[in-house]
C-alpha cells in the first residue's frame, strides 16, 4: 500500500512541477534578427544569444512586417530570414531542440516596418477590410506552421501620441486653459472604427491559432494610447499575454530639448501623467486584465542627450538639452547606447584619467528604486563632450522584476538580447541585465 501512496505523491509532485513551469513568471526575450547584419562588435547572431536562453521562457524573433499590397505577413529581409536565403527564421526555431522548454514566437510590427510617408497607414488599412484581415490571418498561420514557430507576438503599429513637454503646476494650468479654446489634436479620425477592427483581428487570429495551440500575445509599443486603439475588456480573453513596452517615455528624438528618465517605475514629481510602468500596468488591471497576463518590458539600453552651457552643472532631470548625443561605437545610432556601451562610459580603472570625449560620466544611482539611473558629463569651455544619459542597468532591471513580483504580474520582457552585454565586456558576466531581472522574479 505504501508503494502506491508514494507513487501517487510523486505523480502529484510531478504535476505541480509541470504546472509551475507552465504558469510561472514569463521571461520574454526579444531578438532583433537584423542585428546579424551589423559589422564588428555590434553584430549579434542567433548563435551569440544562445547563452541567454536558459533564462528565457520565450524567444521573440523580431520583426516581421505587412505587405502593403496583399496585407499578408512578410519577412522584412527575405534573403536573411527565409529558407530561400540564410534561413534565420529556421535557425531561431531549431533552438528548441537544445532548449526544449523554450517557446519561439514571431513578432510582427515593432516600429521596424515603417514607410517614410504615412508610416502607420498599411497597419490601419489592413484592419478596415474583413478580406485583408483574413489574408493576414491565413499568412500568419502558414508562416508559423512552415517555420515551426510557437505563436505570434502582435507588436502592432498605431499612430503615436505627440511628445509632451514637462510642465510645472503653473504650466499645466496655463496649458489646460489654452486647450479650452484650441481643443485636443486628433490622433486618428477613424480611431473608433480601428479600435473595433483591431478587436476583430485579434479574435480572428485566436480562432485560427487555437486549434494548434499557438500562442497569441500583444505588445503595446511605446507612445501607443491603448485607451484609444484597444478595447481591453474584449481583447484580454483572446490574448495569452499583454506585454507593456513601458520605456522610451522620453527620447532625444521626441524630446530633443529636454532630457529625462526614459523608463521610470513610478511617476517622478511634476512629470507627464501616465508615462511610467506603474501607470500602464494599473490601467490594464483596472480594465479587468488578469494580473498573470501582464508582462513588463525592460530595455537593455540607454538614451543620450547632448548637454550645452544652459544645461547647468547639476545633471538633475529634467535637464535642458540640445538633441541626441553622438552615436554609440557599435550600435551607430544617435543618442542610443547598448548596455555594454553605457557601461564603458561609466567610471572604471581604464578610463579614470581620460579627458574629453573619453572622460567617464558621473553616475547617479536610484536609492529610491522608483525612477532609474542616469549619468552625465557637463560640456567643456567649448560646449563639447557634454552628455546626459538615462539607462537601464542590472540593478534597475532587478527593481522592475521585483515590482512585477510584488504586484503578482505575469513576468518581464527583455528589449532586447542584442543590446544586453552579450560578450561580458563590462563585468565578465554575459547578459547581466537579463540575469539580474530573472533572479528577482
Curated annotation (Swiss-Prot):
Misc: Immunization against the protein decreases early inflammatory responses in the skin of mice bitten by mosquitoes infected with Zika virus and partially protects susceptible mice from lethal Zika virus infection.
BP GO terms, sorted: carbohydrate metabolic process; chitin catabolic process
Disruption phenotype: RNAi-mediated knockdown reduces neutrophil recruitment in the host skin after mosquito bite.
Role this protein plays: Promotes recruitment of host neutrophils at the bite site. Induces expression of IL1B and IL6 in the skin of the host. (Microbial infection) Enhances Zika virus replication and exacerbates disease pathogenesis in the host.
Location of the protein in the cell: Secreted
Membership in a protein family: Belongs to the glycosyl hydrolase 18 family. IDGF subfamily.
GO molecular function list: chitin binding; chitinase activity
Protein keywords: Disulfide bond, Glycoprotein, Secreted, Signal
Expressed in which tissues: Salivary gland (at protein level).
GO cellular component terms listed in the entry, alphabetical order: extracellular region
Protein name: Bacteria-responsive protein 1
Record's signal peptide: 1-18
Disulfide cross-links: 29-56
Sugar attachment sites: 20, 225
GH18 domain sequence ranges: 25-441
